[in-house]
Amino acid sequence: MNSVGRRGPRRANQNGTRRRRRRTVRPVVVVQPNRAGPRRRNGRRKGRGGANFVFRPTGGTEVFVFSVDNLKANSSGAIKFGPSLSQCPALSDGILKSYHRYKITSIRVEFKSHASANTAGAIFIELDTACKQSALGSYINSFTISKTASKTFRSEAINGKEFQESTIDQFWMLYKANGTTTDTAGQFIITMSVSLMTAKXVDSSTPEPKPAPEPTPTPQPTPAPQPTPEPTPAPVPKRFFEYIGTPTGTISTRENTDSISVSKLGGQSMQYIENEKCETKVIDSFWSTNNNVSAQAAFVYPVPEGSYSVNISCEGFQSVDHIGGNEDGYWIGLIAYSNSSGDNWGVGNYKGCSFKNFLATNTWRPGHKDLKLTDCQFTDGQIVERDAVMSFHVEATGKDASFYLMAPKTMKTDKYNYVVSYGGYTNKRMEFGTISVTCDESDVEAERITRHAETPIRSKHILVSERYAEPLPTIVNQGLCDVKTPEQEQTLVDEDDRQTVSTESDIALLEYEAATAEIPDAEEDVLPSKEQLSSKPMDTSGNIIPKPKEPEVLGTYQGQNIYPEDVPPMARQKLREAANAPSTLLYERRTPKKSGNFLSRLVEANRSPTTPTAPSVSTTSNMTREQLREYTRIRNSSGITAAKAYKAQFQ
């Protein structure tokens, strides 16, 4: 029989030998990133490592969401992504202090609008990967203040390809709003993904040294009470104002086959709008140039001291109105423009202004060749309207700073006169067109260019030019006729060409002198010059002189034929009447019909009522028919001086 020993003591000894000592473990605090991946299903814990276990050096990816609040309609600033990101302490003061390297791989910037739908303006953002910019330099990325929107930037745009040291910023985001008020605009909500690498171990068993006790401060004398600081005044709001109006001038016209004259310009009433208030202001105007061919008006706009973006819209149409009587203000015609491509609206310095980025768009509308206005047609390139859109940046210095707006030339010859004809010169009111001048102190260049490009051009107008140009030279107001600009220093206006406002008696005297100059034997040269003839050849009675297809013989004198070019217009008409009338009429005395025209009465008073005017002997004597033809040919081709020299050979 086998015996079995006691197992109790043996079991006790075995338990004693198997008893393990407890090992003291120094706790180590290690920041562990979030684990991306599924959890274990069986719930078993991983085997423990050593006491100083460190997580995988590649780290992980964290997602941070933070906001930038209380953005105003005129706010600006910079958001620095990295250890300087004060808007997100979880990144700058938290996780970046636990890792050596990091990189931000993507960000999503959402602008959440808190503004009303009527709030105007936009907020622009720009990414600076060099971390050096102090102000916004690009206006490509923007959000409308009144709308919520978002933008996403990948690693290529934010320098997120490579890991950065956790002590330096990866990139900055600069922002700036272009509103003019301090109204609330909204907030930025920014979501970013951050990759981390090389964690730092923080040993919590090693106590940090206690700070040394500060020395007892030496008591300081009680300072004198300081005055209560005054509150910082609010910034001065940016100015935005506008001039709108239609300037006018007084002109004198007679028949539409005659030139016009202009009166001195003065103050022009313009509508002035600023801060939603409207009032009437008077600006100065004057003729910058004036001669017998054209006159050019300039309008002076005062500008407060500062820097402004200016946009000007001009719709040039020289409408003419009647003055006085029961029809005061009734439309009576127009003065057309020339078709010169360089005769456009322009801007220049009048006092204390400098310009840059001057952009001008010029258009015109010609008159149709079949249109007839006051018995005149638009068959020679006359322009009915001249419009322009101009924008530029102006720096105004001094309290009296101003710039001038130059209108296209007002043509004074009969070619551009489409006003109802009258027997004598009378004053009429001429408009220069509608002008709008807008000045904005906000100095947003991108908005100025956009405003210029979006200004509508009149439908079907012909584009003359659209380009950056130089402003006009500085001018001063020196009166009606004596203004000189630097471009006109070599062009002197003769005394005979200078225009003044004449009275009716002065005009009548000039008409009388011009008429008596055509009377035979009044002067040596009785033939009218080219300057005395208008575009439509007419005699002094107002009859159109027909152009003969073949040489017309008006009569004979001393055996020689008399041709139309050999006699003055008045004698030419008398000879035609004598040739067409019955022979008995040559000897009848007929009472001449009295004309109501003032000039005709003056001319007829100096004529003999019985004897008709005969051809000038000084023109036709001692010359054969062939010599007369040669005389006429020389006069038409070489001028009156050469013709006189030829005629002197036979006297």
Curated annotation (Swiss-Prot):
Source taxon at top rank: Viruses
CC annotations in GO: host cell periplasmic space; host cell plasmodesma; membrane; viral capsid
Compositionally biased intervals (Polar residues): 531-543
Bias-annotated ranges (Pro residues): 208-236
Biased amino acid composition, Low complexity: 608-621
Positions of region (Disordered): 1-25, 33-52, 201-239, 525-552, 606-626
General remark: This protein is translated as a fusion protein by episodic readthrough of the major coat protein termination codon. It is composed of the major capsid protein fused to a long C-terminal extension called the readthrough domain (RTD). Readthrough of the terminator codon TAG occurs between the codons for 200-Lys and 202-Val.
Name this polypeptide is given: Readthrough protein P3-RTD
Native species: Barley yellow dwarf virus (isolate PAV)
